[in-house]
Amino acid sequence: MPLDPIAYKPYADPDDFIREVTDLIWVDRAIGHIYENYEPDAIVHGSYGTSVGVEEVVQGSLMRISATPDRVGQAEDVVWEARGEDAFLSSHLVLSVDQSTDFISRTIANCLYRRGRMVEEWVVRDSLAICQQLGQDPDEVARVKPFIGYSGSMTEPAPQNVLAVGDSGERPDEYRAEAQMVLEFIDRVWNRRDLNAVEHYWIRDLVLHTIGYRTFTRPEGYRRALLKMLQPFPGGRFEVRDVQTHYAVRYAGLRVAVTWVYKGDYNGADDFGPLTGTPVEILGVSQFLVQDGRLVREVRVYDEIAVRSQIHNRRGDSTYASTNIY
């Protein structure tokens, strides 16, 4: 079923819509356009929780632009997929470069647009990269960031059949085999910890771009990056909240975007200070490039500063002792 142009007009297509609207607001400083672009009661799920209403988006955008006026965010990818006849879900990978401070980082904004208006958004930023490049202490930054918590769809159980219906609604049955392969990989390698199976899904010369603006190559590099992410929360599990696919020559072929939440307890490696045993929720988005039935590249974005914020804000006076004696 073709997408009605009312979903993205006056632009050429959803890709053009996302690129141009983003530039209009963030580069040309048309912050007031947000009132036209977002519904008044738009829902935004970020790394620190859920906010409702366009005013917080306007105010937050103004503060970010003012704090980093030389930063330019440029689209590396736009993975979009229809949601009915008049709506689409886009996964917008943004590469931000600030010429005055020389920091570089990535953001992924997954946006549900209906008739050209933002209804719901899931946005994650690599704040760790900025902290490290600017010489800031990640823990000090985290301590002044409030974790509000999630509401709305994020408090409901993860969709049972995300290939049919995700948090953004019913999706078209496109590229089922490739999307199913990505979900199988997440379940087998990420959740069941079968790290030996990386080669089953990936090419040898794989590339992983992840937080801290770090890049890993080859299966062993991928395994070590995943282990590093999981070791503070070894009993946690990934929940897949949404999936979208899109094929475009411009972006090297088929990409599969996955919105996920990792839920665990800080009872493993003490990477973020003394253990607390308290729960953490990590909202993340991964964009996978698939070529010839194999995974080639992943861009994985989540906010480690928000993770540290949850741990710091939930830290009590008593000392937590791990019960794992293996």
Feature roles, as predicted:
Residues 1-326:
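C-terminal and inter-domain tail/linker signature
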